[in-house]
Amino acid sequence: MLYTFSQSDYPKTELDDYFSYITEKDAVVLWQDGVLLAIKYPDYFAKCKGNCMILKQDILARNLTALLPQSSKIKLISIEELVGITENYLPQLSL
């Protein structure tokens, strides 16, 4: 399953629920304002079982590169890579 997060203001209890369902076979993509989640809640992504990715152009547009946790396992991806990811992971839950 592909989980895409596009907002920065999900309630912590809601994020707890979503991340409890994520398995090794899933992917998580942060884009638009969702890229802020990696900075606000780095512990979620450090413990995430899925393949975590963040859209590079959205990080650059918000000048957040220096704020990303150095130990983060989140991979920066291009828009072209995102297209391939959406083709490979089904179904998709867009949040």
Swiss-Prot record:
Gene Ontology terms: cellular component: cytoplasm
InterPro entries, A to Z: DsrEFH-like, Sulphur_relay_TusB/DsrH
Cited Gene3D superfamilies: DsrEFH-like
Origin superkingdom: Bacteria
Signal sequence region: none
GO BP, sorted A to Z: tRNA wobble position uridine thiolation
Pfam family, one: DsrH
UniProt name for this protein: Uncharacterized protein HI_0577
Organism: Haemophilus influenzae (strain ATCC 51907 / DSM 11121 / KW20 / Rd)
Lineage, broadest ranks: Bacteria, Pseudomonadati, Pseudomonadota, Gammaproteobacteria, Pasteurellales
